[in-house]
Design a protein with these regions (language model features):
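Helical cap/lid subdomain of alpha/beta-hydrolase-fold lipid enzymes
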Residues: 107-246
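Alpha-helical transmembrane segments and their juxtamembrane interfaces
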Residues: 12-13, 44, 71, 131, ...
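Serine-dependent carboxylesterase/thioesterase catalytic core
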Residues: 24-34, 40-41, 45, 51-63, ...
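Sec-dependent N-terminal signal peptides
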Residues: 4-14
């Protein structure tokens, strides 16, 4: 526990938006994009592990519960232009709604970067949890315009996205601690997104015994992320219960 706290503290000091420390010579850059209602802090441990693996890490924050998707995408574009325009290759690792943000970004700026993308628990085809609660005035305030657009209907933000025209790997969980949400979701889920709704056509796909909020903190997930960024492949199809935490 103490080691994890130290790693997180160091990560917060080192991984600061678009001002990372000098990377190793020849290091490739990975952009981290967090999920709905989260901050850069949620990706700090994963960022530390990617840094240890030799990547230059840029951990991007954005107002996930306040801005519409269009503004979030433009904010991401501006932040990447400020720090990464001279790079030949740029990878992305996302959590939850961050995956939808990056898919929208790459759909509009498809020639900007040539790297790989790993999405953790993305609502690639929406979430039944949004369907159930998006009409609540309180939840609409809490989720914001982008979050309430993550439903499963054909007009939702994720279901209006075109094919992913980049190398993509998806990792999602099949464990839950939110029984109410899971009651709303058919089939295996991670407490927020059904396993089947995380899939993206043509993408490599891996299921792990993890919950939605903490999948990014698993050491075995970080290892699979590194594998995909380096080779375009995961090392296995499914991870055992005993591996990692979260």
């Amino acid at each position: 526990m103490r080691r994890t706290f130290v790693v997180l503290l160091v990560s917060l000091l080192v991984i600061t938006g678009c001002s990372p420390p000098p990377p190793p010579a020849g290091a490739e850059t990975v952009v981290l994009v967090h999920g709905l209602g989260r901050t850069r802090v949620s990706m700090a441990l994963l960022g530390s592990r990617l840094g240890d693996a030799g990547f230059r890490v840029v951990n991007v924050g954005y107002p996930s519960t306040r801005a519409p998707m269009e503004e979030i995408v433009e904010l991401l574009r501006a932040r990447l232009e400020a720090c990464c325009t001279a790079l030949d290759r740029l990878h992305f690792v996302t959590h939850s709604m961050g995956g939808i943000v990056v898919r929208r970004y790459l759909a509009e700026y498809s020639t900007a970067h040539e790297g790989r993308v790993v999405m953790l628990s993305p609502p690639s085809h929406g979430s039944e949890v949004i369907d159930a609660f998006a009409d609540s005035p309180l939840l609409r305030v809490l989720l914001g315009p982008a979050g309430t657009g993550l439903g499963t209907d054909s007009a939702s933000i994720p279901n209006r996205l075109g094919p992913a025209r980049f190398e993509l790997g998806v990792i999602t969980g099949n464990r839950t601690v939110n029984l109410i949400n899971s009651w709303l979701i058919p089939g295996p889920d991670d407490g927020k997104v059904a396993v089947d709704r995380a899939r993206v056509e043509g993408a490599a796909f891996l299921v792990v015994p993890a919950t939605h909020p903490f999948i990014m903190n698993r050491q075995d997930v970080a290892a699979e992320v590194v594998s995909f960024l380096r080779t375009g492949r995961f090392t296995r199809r499914e991870l055992p219960d005993s591996a990692g935490t979260g």
